[in-house]
């Protein structure tokens, strides 16, 4: 009897081992959904500690009903104003302004650049005229311009293929932005994870695989070259005000952005859509944001849902530890609250945005 029982136990143990081993071998990282077992505080920040201006959002609401719901959500969570980066000129820009026109206190609009006919005689005059027209229609800034190495491809309807922000041909346009007091919001490069091989050593998988930057294309600028192009434009246009998106995509080394802040008073950066990149290193990030509290602005770039806003508030305000937001951010790593002091939050949430919106060259 004892021998039979022992065999049954050994058999069950082997079966359990095999089952676990198979499960381990079959588990894909994209399906990994860890749940924290730590009994640590779970803070719900229903409303931001100070009034918020979201300096980086887009045209997420496509119907009057959706816009009305967005406004209700903003009021509920404490976002008093949202900047909609339309990318667009022409009728595309006009249609966004018209659709949101019922809520002038809640939304600001930024337009793109018009590259139609770039390189041909008269292009710059046309581009400036369209910029002025957009300004009269309601544009109060430029953005989001975007260059991941192949030129400023975000602008609509005509992207600036091969045109980087420091291209001398753009200088009259940048000068006109300064004259009209229109800040220039620009996305250059991507974060370091997106340039690394999508292999077992990349701690940003699977998100880095999704946003991977292919550097095999001839003439494509890399991360450091794109940061140089941004610096050139900021340096050569001191009366223009620039806002680098996403911590200038330097989350793995915020000192890169800090060096630019130290040199150029006309440069700011938003923190949009990089909460998951910086919250795994909370002490480093909090120290950086405290040091440069006058140069950073809140942004989301992640939709219009209340849960999204509250997740960003939790990261900025709480001291929560080791929690996951896989569905929001796509990373498998745990997040940590930055527990920023009130004076930092007040500036990042709203005061710096007011300086940008009302800046005088």
Predicted regions span which residues?
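An N-terminally biased module of ancient metal coordination in phosphate/nucleic-acid-related enzymes
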Residues: 24-105
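H/E-rich (His + Asp/Glu) clusters that bind or coordinate divalent metals
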Residues: 63-64, 71, 218, 224-232, ...
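Bacterial N-terminal signal peptides that target proteins for export
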Residues: 1-13
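Acidic-and-aromatic substrate-binding clefts and catalytic sites of carbohydrate-active enzymes
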Residues: 59-67, 84-94, 116-125, 164, ...
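Hydrophobic faces of well-ordered beta-strands that scaffold small-molecule active sites
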Residues: 52-57, 82-84, 107-112, 142-144, ...
């Amino acid at each position: 009897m004892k021998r039979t029982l022992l065999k049954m136990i050994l058999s069950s143990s082997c079966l359990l081992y095999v089952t676990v081993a198979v499960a381990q071998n079959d588990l894909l990282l994209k399906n990994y959904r860890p749940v924290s077992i730590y009994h640590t505080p779970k803070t719900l920040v229903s409303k931001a500690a100070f009034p918020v201006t979201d300096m980086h959002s887009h045209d997420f609401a496509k119907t009057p009903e959706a816009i009305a719901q967005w406004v209700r959500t903003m009021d509920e969570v404490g976002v008093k104003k949202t900047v909609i980066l339309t990318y667009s000129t022409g009728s595309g820009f006009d249609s966004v302004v018209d659709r949101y026109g019922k809520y002038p206190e809640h939304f600001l609009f930024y337009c793109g650049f018009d590259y139609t006919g770039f390189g041909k005689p008269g292009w710059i005059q046309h581009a400036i005229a369209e910029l002025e027209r957009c300004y009269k229609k309601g544009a109060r800034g430029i953005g989001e311009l975007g260059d991941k190495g192949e030129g400023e491809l975000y602008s609509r309807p005509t992207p600036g293929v091969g045109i980087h922000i420091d291209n001398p041909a753009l200088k009259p346009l940048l000068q006109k932005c300064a004259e009209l007091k229109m800040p220039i919001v620009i996305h250059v490069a991507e974060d370091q994870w997106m340039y690394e091989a999508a292999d077992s050593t990349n701690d940003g998988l699977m998100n880095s695989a999704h946003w991977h930057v292919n550097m095999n294309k001839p003439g494509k600028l890399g991360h450091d070259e794109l940061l140089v192009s941004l610096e050139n434009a900021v340096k050569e246009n001191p009366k223009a005000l620039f806002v680098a998106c996403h911590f200038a995509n330097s989350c793995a080394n915020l000192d890169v952005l800090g060096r630019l802040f130290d040199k150029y008073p006309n440069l700011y950066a938003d923190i949009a859509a990089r909460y998951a990149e910086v919250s795994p290193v909370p002490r480093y990030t909090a120290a950086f944001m405290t040091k440069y509290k006058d140069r950073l602005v809140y942004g989301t770039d992640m939709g219009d849902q209340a849960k999204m806003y509250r997740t960003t508030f939790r990261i900025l305000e709480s001291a929560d530890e080791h929690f996951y937001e896989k569905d929001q951010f796509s990373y498998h790593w745990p997040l940590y609250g930055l527990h920023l002091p009130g004076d930092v939050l007040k500036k990042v949430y709203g005061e710096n945005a007011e300086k940008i919106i009302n800046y005088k060259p």
